[in-house]
């Protein structure tokens, strides 16, 4: 989603608060909880899950391995839930021609760098760069090349834009900023 006027362009960036991330966190939580329950029931000799008898799974080595996978899955699930709740990666890109300033804001993990705020002068922007890699794991990324800073990604790599859409977005942004486009 974006908002534009003659002198200001604001591009809102969706972070990790997506339906797919929610589904993966939920599925991983349920699966790892199941593994942990099976491992615990094999250790205690009681049936926590009524699908099979606890005597079918011997604690050493199957029960230990299932408990380990359950605990590891719960940690990964906790990480996914935290990134989902904190909305890591969301923010905005603000291009202001009137002031000649570009502001990039992203939410990070809690701590010193929770708020990531970058500010550049428009005259320091060298170009808008498109990186396209076709194949099995196709990747299309839009970068802003800054003098002395390198390339800053403007679009998340997991967003599946077509080549036409990324070219259109790059052309509009390059026209607005009055900079050239580079393709790699």
Curated annotation (Swiss-Prot):
GO terms for cellular component: chloroplast thylakoid membrane; photosystem I. One of its GO terms (biological process) is photosynthesis. InterPro entries: PSI_Ycf4_assembly (IPR003359). Coiled coil: none annotated. The keyword Membrane applies. It holds the Pfam family Ycf4. The chain crosses the membrane at residues 22-42, 57-77. It is found in: Plastid, Chloroplast thylakoid membrane. Its main location: plastid. It is a multi-pass membrane protein. Keywords: Chloroplast, Membrane, Photosynthesis, Plastid, Thylakoid, Transmembrane, Transmembrane helix. Seems to be required for the assembly of the photosystem I complex. HAMAP family: Ycf4 (MF_00437). PANTHER family: PHOTOSYSTEM I ASSEMBLY PROTEIN YCF4, PTHR33288. Belongs to the Ycf4 family. This is Photosystem I assembly protein Ycf4. It comes from Arabis hirsuta (Hairy rock-cress). The gene is ycf4.
